[in-house]
From Swiss-Prot:
This is Trigger factor. InterPro entries: PPIase_dom_sf (IPR046357), PPIase_FKBP_dom (IPR001179), Trig_fac (IPR005215), Trigger_fac_C (IPR008880), Trigger_fac_C_sf (IPR037041), Trigger_fac_ribosome-bd_bac (IPR008881), Trigger_fac_ribosome-bd_sf (IPR036611), Trigger_fact/SurA_dom_sf (IPR027304). Pfam families: FKBP_C, Trigger_C, Trigger_N. Its main location: cytoplasm. Signal peptide: none annotated. Its EC number is 5.2.1.8. Consists of 3 domains; the N-terminus binds the ribosome, the middle domain has PPIase activity, while the C-terminus has intrinsic chaperone activity on its own. GO terms for biological process: 'de novo' cotranslational protein folding; cell division; chaperone-mediated protein folding; protein transport; protein unfolding. The keyword Cytoplasm applies.
């Protein structure tokens, strides 16, 4: 085998591989001898078919099989000998005439074109300095949650005033209704004993408002228009009339924060409810703190590393992002600041995001590789099982999906690997804790107030990872700048959602047509 370097520019390499015809013929002869004892042909005793006859009958077919084995084998051998780490699957192109090669009249010649991984020295984690903002759970936060829970769980009773009572905002009106389009009753537009909480916004615009002032026994005709984006396409944008009969009026009772509230929520007493809320908020603050320190870390890593990126990797990442951006454009979901930008301007911004994602992905991968960080089978199995429980009754199908789809497993593995590398870096880095308010902790970088005095915690270990923590900073290969934009949160946010397996969650039961699309 002869290997000739045809091109070398930046991270691109092209090699020509030549396997001489004599070598191919020797391989063919060896293969024929290997299979000869098993060949069965009419007119010959088993295992006694002449080599020349086998070559004549099956030579080209056997040679084709040999070439199919040779291409990946020689490609890998070339990569190993040249000590190359491909950034993506090499492109293979055969340049010799297949007919002549199969007939043993020509050398087998093919080219390998590939992009290699950049060679760079990753930053020393011990020399990195990052900030971890932390916020304590305040009593006011718990009190606010208690009031909200009390209001949400309060009971309703028949409204005082008897037949003279009128429906007010916050009341529940019990009604029968029949919906009509152009005078005709439509499917799904009728219900009996429906409970309408005025002001909740659970029904289509105008429905609840027209019940204000209604009395028990009263009949009303409600004129409404279904939203243009209504879930039932046949009703979207259409005017409808609902004939309503009021059967009952209920008003909310006093919202009390007491032991009874806690018991209704499944806890022993009010103190237990307060403790549960504190733990929940502490967990949420911890997740947000983790996201912020990780974002700071990724920003520092991005600033520390400047090296050439494999064009195909960047192109593939950009294509993934742009598909979602294009969808956001079609749905008119771009942020106001982006709506007046040209397509070229938007593409330029998102290409920078793609480059950042790829750069950070390569940096974290290299740090992980050099420090023997890997994802164990136990960690992977745990993640798959956690995904499976999201699909009640279909857990087995989800697990089988991952067992049969290596790409899906790779998608599951990537964020786990990244979090382990981030944990490793944070254990060695100089982490400074900053006590901030809850508002500052959850504010975007461009909205955050001035930083308060810092409390240094040298080389403090990162907190334990939170289960199911949602973060705009994972995986790092999917990291976008801190710039806030709804479209960019969908298309360029730091984690592109993994594709769901074939087993889907069951759809909830359809609501009455009068209710708006959730």
């Amino acid at each position: 085998m002869n290997v000739i370097e045809k091109a070398s520019e930046g991270l691109s390499r092209t090699y020509e591989i030549v396997i001489p015809a004599d070598d191919l013929q020797a391989r063919l002869a060896a293969k024929i001898e290997e299979i000869r004892p098993e060949v069965r042909l009419k007119g010959f005793r088993p295992g006694k078919v002449p080599t020349s006859h086998i070559r004549k009958m099956f030579g080209e077919s056997i040679m084709g099989d040999l070439l199919n084995e040779l291409v990946p084998d020689t490609t890998q051998k070339t990569l190993d000998e040249k000590k190359l780490r491909p950034a993506s699957q090499p492109d293979i192109s055969v340049t010799s005439e297949a007919k002549d090669v199969l007939a043993g009249k020509a050398d087998f010649v093919f080219e390998i074109a590939l992009e290699i991984m950049p060679d760079f020295e990753p930053a020393d984690p011990a020399k990195l300095s990052v900030t971890r903002p932390v916020a304590e759970v305040e009593d006011a936060e718990v009190d606010e949650a208690l009031e909200r829970l009390a209001n949400e769980s309060r009971e309703f009773a028949a409204k005082k005033g008897g037949k003279n009572a009128k429906a007010e905002d916050g009341d529940v009106v019990v009604i029968d209704f029949v919906g009509k389009l152009d005078g005709e009753v439509f499917e799904g537009g009728s219900a009996e004993d429906a409970r309408v909480a005025i002001g909740d916004g659970a029904f289509i615009p105008g429905f609840e408002e027209q019940l204000l002032g209604a009395k028990v026994g009263e009949e009303r005709e409600l004129n409404v228009t279904f939203p243009e984006d209504y879930q039932a396409a046949q009703l979207a944008g259409k005017a409808a009339v609902f004939d309503v009969t009021v059967k009952g009026l209920e008003s909310p009772q006093e919202a009390k924060v007491d032991d009874e509230l806690a018991k209704r929520l499944g806890l022993e007493n009010l103190d237990g409810l307060k403790d549960a809320l504190k733990k929940r908020f502490a967990g949420e603050h911890g997740q947000q703190s983790r996201m912020k320190v990780k974002r700071d870390l990724l920003d520092k890593l991005d600033a520390e590393h400047k090296f050439d990126l494999p064009p195909k990797m960047v192109g593939a990442e950009f294509d993934n992002i742009w598909r979602e951006v294009a969808h956001a454009i079609e749905q008119d979901q771009l942020e106001d600041e982006d709506k007046n930008k040209s397509e070229d301007e938007l593409k330029s911004e998102y290409r920078e995001i793609a480059e950042r994602r790829v750069r950070l992905g390569l940096v974290l991968a290299e740090i992980g590789r050099r420090n023997n960080i890997d994802v164990t089978q136990e960690e992977l199995s745990r993640a798959i099982n956690q995904e499976a429980v999201k699909y009640p009754g279909q857990e087995r199908q989800v697990v089988e999906f991952y067992q049969k789809n290596p790409n899906a497993v790779a998608q599951m593995r990537a964020p786990i690997y990244e979090e382990k590398v981030v944990d490793y870096i944070l254990e060695l880095a100089d982490v400074t804790e900053t006590t901030v308010s809850k508002e500052a902790l959850y504010a975007d970088e461009d909205e955050a107030p001035a930083k308060p005095a810092k409390k240094a915690v040298a080389k403090k270990k990162a907190p334990a990872k939170k289960a199911a923590a949602k973060s705009d900073d994972k995986p790092a290969a999917k990291k976008a700048p801190a710039k806030k934009a709804p479209a960019k949160k969908a298309a360029a946010k730091d984690e592109a959602p993994a594709k769901k397996p074939a087993a889907k969650k069951k759809a909830p039961a359809k609501k009455a047509a009068a209710k708006k699309d959730a």
